[in-house]
C-alpha cells in the first residue's frame, strides 16, 4: 500500500519528490491516507524546509553509517538533494529582482511598471523568519552583479570606480600623429598631418609641408637645397684645398697604361729622382698637417643639457663685405687661422678649407647673407634672437646659461 501511494504521488508531482528534499516519512502506523498525503505535499513549498548545508553538518556523513532503506530520507541527504537545495532555495529569482519578476510573470502590468520604473535594488530579502534563511541568502551575493548586468543594462552604479571601462572617466587616448618612419633621417621627418624639424635642439614647426630639406623661411634657406639644414649644426660639402690636391697628384701620378713613370725604376738602388720625390712628399705632409691643425678648430657643446657626446663641426665663415656697420661688433678675427679669416655671426657660408688666394673669390660666389631675425627654440622655450637668425654654437651655449639663470631667479 505504501509503495502504491508513493508511486502515485511521484507520478503526479515529479519535481517535489526528489530524494532528500522532504522530511522523513512518519511511522507506518500513522501513515496518512492517499488524499491527505497529496494535500500535504501540495501545500508545503520546497523552500519551507531547512537546508542542512548551512548548519555545519556533513551532508555525506549519514551515507556511510546507515544504508538507505526508504525511511531515513532526512538522515541521508544525497548529492542530488544538495544541488536542488541550491537551485530552488538559495537562488530564487525573486531575491534578486524583487517584484520585477512577478510583474513579468503576471503579464506586464503597465501601470505598476510606470509607478516603479526605476527598479531600485537588485536584492529584496524575503519576509521569511525560518531558521537558516539568512545564511542561505548570503550565498547569492557573488551572483548579484552578473544577474543585474543581464537584466538591467541601464544601471551601472555597481561598477567599480577603477574598472577597465574608460567611458566617462575624463581620459582620452589618441594615437600620436607623428611617427618616425623607417629609412629616414631622425632630424627631419613627416607624417600624414604634420612635419617637424629640429633647430638648436628644439622643434621647429613649419607652416608648409614640403619634402625638400630646404626650409620655407629662415636664415639657412639661402643655402643650396642639397645642404642638410635645420639641424644643431650645418653640414655642407667640403672642397679639398690645394695642399691635399698637390699631395694626391704627387702620390698617385697619372701615367699612361703600360708605360713606366719617369724617374722610377725597379732596381734595388734608388735613383736621384726617387729621393727628390720623397723629399717633396715629406714637405707636403708637413704643410698638410700644419693646415689641418690651424684651420680645424672644432666647437664643443659644453652648456647644452642632455647632450650625448660632443658634436664637433667646423664652420668657416668669410667676412661679409656688404654687412651693415652696426654688425661690426659681432665680428671676431680668428688669429690662429693662417689666412686671417673673419668670423661673422650673421652669415653662414659653405664649409671651405683654406685653399690659397682664391678662397675669398670662390666663397663670395656661393655665399649670401641675411638680416632676417626669426624665432627659434632653445631648451623648450621660444627665443627671439636680435643679433642673428641662426646663432653659432658659442652663442647658443651662452643663451642657454642666461635662460637658466632667469628661471632660477623666478623660482
Swiss-Prot record:
Residues 33-43 have a biased composition (Polar residues). Residues 156-172 have a biased composition (Basic and acidic residues). One of its GO terms (biological process) is meiotic cell cycle. GO terms for cellular component: cytosol; nucleus. The keyword Iron does not apply. Has a role in meiosis. This is Meiotically up-regulated gene 147 protein.
Amino acid at each position: 500500500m505504501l509503495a502504491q501511494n508513493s508511486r502515485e504521488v511521484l507520478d503526479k508531482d515529479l519535481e517535489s519528490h526528489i530524494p532528500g528534499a522532504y522530511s522523513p516519512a512518519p511511522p507506518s502506523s500513522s501513515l496518512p491516507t492517499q488524499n491527505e498525503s497529496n494535500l500535504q505535499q501540495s501545500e508545503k513549498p520546497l523552500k519551507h524546509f531547512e537546508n542542512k548545508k548551512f548548519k555545519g553538518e556533513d551532508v555525506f556523513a549519514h551515507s556511510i553509517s546507515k544504508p538507505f532503506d526508504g525511511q531515513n530520507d532526512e538522515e541521508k541527504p544525497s548529492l542530488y538533494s544538495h544541488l536542488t537545495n541550491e537551485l530552488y532555495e538559495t537562488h530564487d529569482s525573486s531575491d534578486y529582482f524583487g517584484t520585477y519578476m512577478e510583474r513579468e510573470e503576471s503579464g506586464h502590468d503597465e501601470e505598476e511598471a510606470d509607478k516603479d520604473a526605476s527598479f531600485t535594488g537588485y536584492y529584496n530579502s524575503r519576509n521569511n523568519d525560518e531558521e537558516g534563511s539568512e545564511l542561505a541568502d548570503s550565498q547569492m551575493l557573488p551572483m548579484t552583479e552578473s544577474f543585474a548586468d543581464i537584466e538591467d543594462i541601464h544601471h551601472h552604479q555597481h561598477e567599480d570606480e577603477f574598472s577597465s571601462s574608460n567611458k566617462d572617466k575624463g581620459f582620452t587616448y589618441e594615437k600620436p600623429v607623428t611617427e618616425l618612419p623607417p629609412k629616414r633621417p631622425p632630424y627631419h621627418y613627416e607624417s600624414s598631418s604634420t612635419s617637424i624639424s629640429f633647430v638648436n635642439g628644439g622643434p621647429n614647426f613649419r607652416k608648409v609641408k614640403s619634402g625638400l630639406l630646404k626650409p620655407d623661411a629662415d636664415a639657412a634657406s639661402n643655402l643650396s637645397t642639397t645642404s642638410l639644414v635645420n639641424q644643431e649644426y650645418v653640414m655642407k660639402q667640403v672642397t679639398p684645398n690645394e695642399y691635399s690636391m698637390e699631395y694626391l697628384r704627387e702620390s698617385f701620378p697619372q701615367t699612361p697604361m703600360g708605360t713606366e713613370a719617369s724617374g722610377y725604376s725597379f732596381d734595388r738602388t734608388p735613383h736621384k729622382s726617387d729621393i727628390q720625390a720623397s723629399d717633396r712628399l715629406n714637405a707636403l705632409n708637413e704643410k698638410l698637417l700644419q693646415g689641418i691643425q690651424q684651420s680645424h678648430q672644432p666647437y664643443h657643446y659644453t652648456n647644452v643639457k642632455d647632450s650625448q657626446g660632443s658634436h664637433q663641426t667646423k664652420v668657416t665663415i668669410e667676412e661679409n663685405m656688404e654687412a651693415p656697420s652696426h654688425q661690426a661688433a659681432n665680428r671676431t678675427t680668428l688669429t690662429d687661422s693662417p689666412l686671417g679669416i673673419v668670423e661673422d655671426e650673421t652669415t653662414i657660408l659653405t664649409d671651405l678649407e683654406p685653399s690659397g688666394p682664391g678662397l675669398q673669390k670662390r666663397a663670395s660666389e656661393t655665399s649670401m647673407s641675411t638680416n632676417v631675425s626669426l624665432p627659434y627654440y632653445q631648451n623648450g622655450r621660444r627665443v627671439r634672437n636680435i643679433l642673428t637668425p641662426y646663432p653659432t654654437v658659442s652663442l647658443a651655449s651662452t643663451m642657454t646659461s642666461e635662460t637658466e639663470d632667469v628661471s632660477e631667479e623666478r623660482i
